[in-house]
Amino acid sequence: MKKTLSILMSFGLLFSANLKNEAISFPSKVISSEGNNINVGKLTEGSTVIIITIKSPSCPVCQTQLIRIGKQLDNFNKCNVTFLVLSPGTSKEVHQVKLTTEFPFPFIPNDDLLISKALGLLLNPQQILPSIIVLNDNLTINWIQKGRNNIYFGDDELYDYLDCDNWI
């Protein structure tokens, strides 16, 4: 019974994509793993802001996803996007993921997990539910894809949602 419940919960996490929840907002200002202040509100004025959450700094599937998206940046750049990566862990741990993946966008340490909790993405006291979030200009969630595993990353779904091929 426990195994069946676990499988059903996994499918629930895997296929809970495209949910809208206008009541939740991302913080307007955050600090990167390099100590830089980031005005997220300002970023949304000039581009579509996409938040990639990773389960933990040691999550290999999450790192693979960042590398996959990094290889597709020419396609994503067609629709004027910028990424932020939200991860549990210290600045040092999170920055190491940035260096390892060579993902060229800011990484946001969420050591206290307050942002993840506010977004409803807390898996446990040390981990975030891996997700992709597209923000509205007012920092609320426009689109969210929850869940990730070694055969399902969600980046294709994001690209389809953004419809970058039809941008002028």
Model-predicted regions and their roles:
Residues 4-13:
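Sec-dependent N-terminal signal peptides
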Residues 16-42, 64:
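N-terminal "domain-start" segment that seeds a small globular fold
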Residues 43-63, 67-69:
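Short active-site neighborhood of thiol/selenol oxidoreductases, capturing the structured segment around
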Residues 63-102, 113-117:
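Structural microenvironment flanking redox-active thiols in thiol-disulfide oxidoreductases
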Residues 104-105, 123-133:
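Structural micro-motif
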Residues 106-110:
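Short acidic-hydrophobic, aromatic-tinged amphipathic segments that line or gate anion-handling sites
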Residues 129-168:
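Thiol-/selenol-based redox modules, centered on thioredoxin-like
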